[in-house]
């Protein structure tokens, strides 16, 4: 399953999101959701404990001036990569 988080993690039910995530799922952080990938942040630690792969949309990171603050452990993807993730997964759940 591809999960997308497009709101600030402070405005999302992260606990509920984690409950429905399964091994092998991907989470793509978009729009204000990219703030969840800030190095040393509370939400990054929580998300990295899940059995998922974590990505950020690079254009949204750049638009927010966060390029130097995103953790190196988080994959950075383009819109083309976003399409590839969509094709990879049979379903998508937006948060």
UniProtKB/Swiss-Prot annotation:
tRNA processing among keywords: yes
Domain of life: Bacteria
Record keyword Cell cycle present: no
Family matches, as InterPro entries: DsrEFH-like, Sulphur_relay_TusB, Sulphur_relay_TusB/DsrH
GO biological process: tRNA wobble position uridine thiolation
GO cellular component: sulfurtransferase complex
Subcellular location: Cytoplasm
Short name of any one Pfam family annotated for the protein: DsrH
Keywords annotated in UniProt: Cytoplasm, tRNA processing
Subunit text: Heterohexamer, formed by a dimer of trimers. The hexameric TusBCD complex contains 2 copies each of TusB, TusC and TusD. The TusBCD complex interacts with TusE.
NCBIfam families named in the record: PRK13510.1, sulf_tusB_dsrH
Family assignment from sequence similarity: Belongs to the DsrH/TusB family.
Role noted for this protein: Part of a sulfur-relay system required for 2-thiolation of 5-methylaminomethyl-2-thiouridine (mnm(5)s(2)U) at tRNA wobble positions.
UniProt name for this protein: Protein TusB
């Amino acid at each position: 399953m591809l999960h997308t988080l497009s709101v600030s993690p402070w405005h999302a039910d992260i606990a509920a999101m984690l409950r429905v995530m399964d091994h092998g799922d991907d989470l793509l952080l978009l729009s204000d959701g990219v703030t969840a990938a800030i190095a040393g942040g509370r939400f990054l630690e929580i998300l990295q404990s899940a059995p998922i792969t974590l990505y950020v949309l690079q254009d949204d990171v750049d638009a927010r001036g966060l390029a130097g603050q995103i953790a190196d452990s988080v994959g950075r993807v383009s819109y083309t990569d976003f399409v590839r993730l969509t094709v990879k997964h049979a379903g998508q759940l937006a948060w």
